[in-house]
Design a protein with these regions (language model features):
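Acidic/histidine-rich, metal-coordinating catalytic segments
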Residues: 127-144
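Charge-rich, low-complexity amphipathic helices
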Residues: 88, 145-146
């Protein structure tokens, strides 16, 4: 099943050591928080930013692969959930293009929502992720994110 358009814009911001895919237990949603989508892509693919995600859902609904699932992307940062710390290792990060609260927050587009649903269902099935393990960045880093 291929729901991802062949758009690949790899980020250099991930651990080179491959992980055991059975470790993946969470999906973490983020919004880019930048005025322009192209600036968000530039940041996510810049070595200096030290931030990335596995996927980016663009305004038009396209899904961009930023870091292959086999690698640990740097998206969760200093994070915790229940008894776990540093959730990068056991999660998939999905960035959603959106200016966020600091830049005139906008509702997600219908195309984005449909793509997010398709990608979420695909990843849930692929990695056997339970529904309560779909989280927002603000859930795992409440003092750093709104």
């Amino acid at each position: 099943m291929s729901i991802i358009k062949k758009i690949i814009n790899y980020s250099p911001n991930f651990n080179l050591k491959k992980r055991n895919l059975k470790q993946i237990k969470f999906i973490i949603f983020h919004y880019t928080g930048m005025k322009k989508e192209k600036d968000a892509i530039k940041k996510l693919t810049s070595l200096q930013s030290e931030v990335s995600s596995h996927y980016l859902v663009k305004n038009n609904g396209d899904i961009v692969v930023m870091v292959p699932d086999l690698y640990v992307a740097w998206h969760a940062g200093k994070s915790s959930w229940k008894n776990l710390r540093s959730l990068n290792i056991n999660s998939i990060g999905i960035e959603i293009s959106n200016p966020g609260h600091d830049h005139n927050y906008k509702s997600f587009s219908k195309k984005q929502i449909l793509s997010i649903l398709k990608l979420s269902k695909f990843l849930k099935k692929k990695y056997n992720i339970i529904s309560k393990n779909f989280l927002g960045h603000s859930d795992i880093a409440p003092f750093r994110k709104k």
